Amino acid sequence: LSNMANASVKEFGKAWWSEVYNRIIGAAVFLDDASAECLHWDGGIFNLLNGGAVTVKTLSPFEVRSKVYKKAVFITQTTSTQLRTIHEIIQNSDFTHCILISCVSLDTVYLELNEGKDVSDVIASGRAQSEATKHLEGLLTEWIGKKQSAVEVVHIPIFTISPTSVVFLTPPYQNMYPTYNGKLIPDTSSLDLYTLTNDERSQVRRLASCLNSMLDSMNLKEDIFYMGAYSSLVAGVLENSPVCISRRKTCSNPASLIIVDRTLDLCAVTSHSMESVLDKVMAVLPRFPGHSNEVAVDMSPLCEANVIAHPEDIQLSPGCLFHANDESCMQTYDHMINKSQKEVMFDLYNKVSKIDVQKSPGARALLKVTPQSVEKIITATKGNYETIGRHLGMVQQALGVVQTLKAPRRAQLDLLTSLEAQVVQSLAASRDSTSVLHQISQLIKSRKDRNLPLENLLALIVHVYSLTGTEVSFSKKHEDNLSETLSVAIFEDHKTLFDEDPGRIVTPEACEEVAKGVMSRLKEVAQMRKILQNYQSVLKACEGGAGHEYRGVLQQLAEELVDARRPALPDLRRRHDPVKDLLRTGISMLTSKKPRASKHPLDNATVIIYVVGGITAEECKRLHRSVITSGVDNTVLIGSTRFVTPGEAMRDVLAL
């Protein structure tokens, strides 16, 4: 298991889940939300129940206790809060055998258990893992409180999901974002882990430790590159922690790991112009409860249940898009990322035609497949549970796409897409004399007439500030006017904009402060690419000469990365040990040989690009396409914290 050479991230996940399944026979299994989400992408709850678990529960102090279970398996991130929850569950149960599966490496857990103490000796000598194991096993034994008991603490790196063979996401880090004590730009130029809050520092260490486990399992010895201040911190932990250093001595397959801050370019994630069907579905349908990358499909059109409040209604479980045990569904899911809407609709129509009780015309006979033509076939199976059961995954996917394309929200997104296109051309044409902010202020004032949610207009404003960067200066008058307009709008829409306590009083003055905070964050967003050399501009003239288009930082990086001429990549930084660099320079002067050319990421067969702060399906498609069309032989994997929608990306960056 420690040497899955040349393996994909998907195989990495599967191999470690099988280690979990080996331990669950006869057990009550308790999972935290992130592990439950990872389980869904490996096949779901039946993997546990069919594998011998007697019950599966949420890791919660409110979970109903039962004295009948004697063995418990806890699958967790091993945070201090989760350890308290485990303590409560054990105290209220009658377990004699407890297994704690930590999804995070135990040396990282050891650092957190000893926050504020000097444990450098233990870390340097490599004893952190065994010390943490001993400590946690002692706690479990104490909590069980019986003479005859068995405990085990084991690290199993469950943290990835694989929507496709080249894309992976990391649910435990879904809320991780490049901020420093909550700010987008750090207060100091000498940045280190201690510039961060305790929680932020813990997240950086945890992510680095998980990436280390993945590289270890895939037998990869990496060169680390980064773009952005936050990514430099993750790179620093990976470069310098003793566990990572010793792993690089034993792993043999060379790889390049490129870590990128999302905040350098927020245009793609705040854009409403979506070609990928998956992005459209994610933007329209509600999230599956407890999940960051899955949607809830309303299944009531096929059932007799009278659903009132989808997806929370307890009468009927929501459907979803990803079905790990159905090859045909996984192919459709891949199409939803990588193919056009027309191709996805034909694919779905061909598949649902096989269950058609009314014998509709074949897809070839149709000039166009509409949501209505797919819906007609599916709803004809209402109440026919045997047929629905045989094609359950495909029916959920088809319903999800149909509900998205027929939703009133689609019309909102189309309007926002056209507004966005106008904004881009207006910015490109007028530059500093632009009246874009004035136009957006007018849009906010008339949003109710146009049926435009404030959340999406805020995403449009973030899009504008990230797109212009430092290339355009907005007039103070327009910015003040926008701040005033936002203040009124936030007060009017605060109930829909914030998930707030219904008893909380919101005043116009408080909303004015929120609006000022939004404006100062937007000005920081515009400064983000100042640190870059080649990728400061993302607004490029179209090749045909007509108008301008957005070409993102990730896209520009990918194109230069696979360019056969190997152009210099000054924006891809590497962390070097200055002492070693001095020694190398001294030795090369003595031996009079030319100094070595700097390393290029494609010198290594495997390249992993990881974006901290979210990515869209469309970006994954474009990055993958750049690699495929270039003809390079390298395996390029694309990872991120989660899939994001414009509304989520806006909330992340504005801290709303």
Question: Predicted regions span which residues?
Answer:
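Extended, well-folded catalytic/binding cores that form a central cleft or groove in large enzyme
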Residues: 2-656
